[in-house]
Amino acid sequence: MGDDLVKVKICGITNEEDIAYISKKVHAVGVIVDVPVKTPRKISLDKAIELKKYVAPFTSLVTVLMPNSIEEVLEIYNALKPNAIQLHGFESLDFVKELNKLKNTGELNAHIIKVIHIPKDEEIDFKTLLNTAKEYEKYVEAILVDTKIESIKLEGKTHNWAVSKKLRESLEKPLILAGGLNKDNVLEAIKTVKPYAIDVSSSLEAYGGKKDLKKVDEFLEVIKKV
């Protein structure tokens, strides 16, 4: 993986085999911990702690959360010590500001990634979307754009990449592109958006929660063509 390549995070990892194999091939691996939605990719904090032992050196561990409180974030952070925390719900700006304060005091030593949900074209108010992203980016290390669907289900669906492109061009912090990426559309997505990184999960599965390692390899081979 050269520095000229878009960075890759593979998310929704649930087992030792997948994390040991995948973490040797990508920049970051993601675990979805105790989120309040039904998904086969959700694992417990204890399981996440166990999986961390299998992460390859120099690969970042990202914990995906939809927390109800600052205390919940700190509890998971202190137990797991991930490299980054991805806030994937509708966390308020004040909530993110509070986490940023904890970073400044040294209580939290992890990058913060905040998701921005991109709605269907007919529902997009780009000015509001951009203003929201600009407010959040003051307090985080990266903005992740994902497709907004009915009640967050952490399932991969694509959105209008032109919107993500405009956001990327307007923001100062790195933009991570997620939402329905697969080996057939990822080159077009990268060419259109030019993101700092991409985030992929469900398209690389054999079944819910279990990655198909052949699909992973095929996807990463496509990325090399960028």
From Swiss-Prot:
It comes from the Archaea. InterPro entries: Aldolase_TIM (IPR013785), PRAI_dom (IPR001240), RibuloseP-bd_barrel (IPR011060), TrpF_fam (IPR044643). GO terms for biological process: L-tryptophan biosynthetic process. CDD domains: PRAI. One of its GO terms (molecular function) is phosphoribosylanthranilate isomerase activity. Its EC number is 5.3.1.24. This is N-(5'-phosphoribosyl)anthranilate isomerase.
